[in-house]
Amino acid sequence: MSTEMSTTAGPVREAIERDAIGSRLWFYANYHCNLACAYCLTESAPDVARRVLDPDLMVELADQGRNLGFTSIGVTGGEPFLVPEMPELLGRLSELLPVVVLSNGTLFSGGRLERMRPLGERELRVQISLDRSEAVANDEMRGPENFRKVVEAIPKLVDLGIGVRIASTLAWVDDDDMATLCELHRSLGVPDEDHVVRGVVRRGRALTEGLGEPAGINELGPELTISADGAFWSPFGPTVVAGRVDTDLLVSRAVSPLSRPAEALAGLVTGSGSAGPTDDRFT
């Protein structure tokens, strides 16, 4: 497993401690998904290019990230649990830093659910998307049977001792709808502090569908995000439109050693950095 020299940790650790860049290191595990949500940032669907990030590389970079000063890990996609070894990978990552993994919550049954059992003892939370308190409105944006599968899966994970967060992505919601949604997540074993409500970001498929609010470098906080296509400014950065990955928020094509994109991001925020000769960055 790789480590970083302590001398390279300085500017990145300082930027993290000053809240100049986010303390969570993000990984896009993959881009394919069993759903095709209307507002998806990455145009994910069953038949898209998978763009899987090598699991061993994720562990190596997470170890380097810990030495650089990052304090937690985020794993997103696509649907991360379509990566066959994801439960075991989350175990490896959580040995290094606390982990949150974002999921649509529809794949937790049978053998996969059983493979999640050891993670109940780890610093791991599964953040599951649930947008509405009733099936018709929820499934309109996320797909048939999504609501049923999610409300069945959440208590199963809670029973395993796994921390669950619920993320609701909403273009709008009235007070009554929000109250009903909160009653639902409480009944599933998820407290108010673990309910995240966010707006639709107009990138990816949401841009094509005309949904949400525009978001670029001025609207998105800097959080180092690693994908198979490079390192990005934010987990909202490596979005896909018409099958092509957006590069307006690309920090570096190089992702290893992690100090390279981490220092580039810190430099962009503080105004002290410059791109290397082989870097492909936004301007």
Sequence positions of predicted segments:
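Short acidic, glycine/proline-rich loop/turn micro-motifs
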Residues: 137-140, 208
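Accessory C-terminal segments flanking Radical SAM cores
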Residues: 201-283
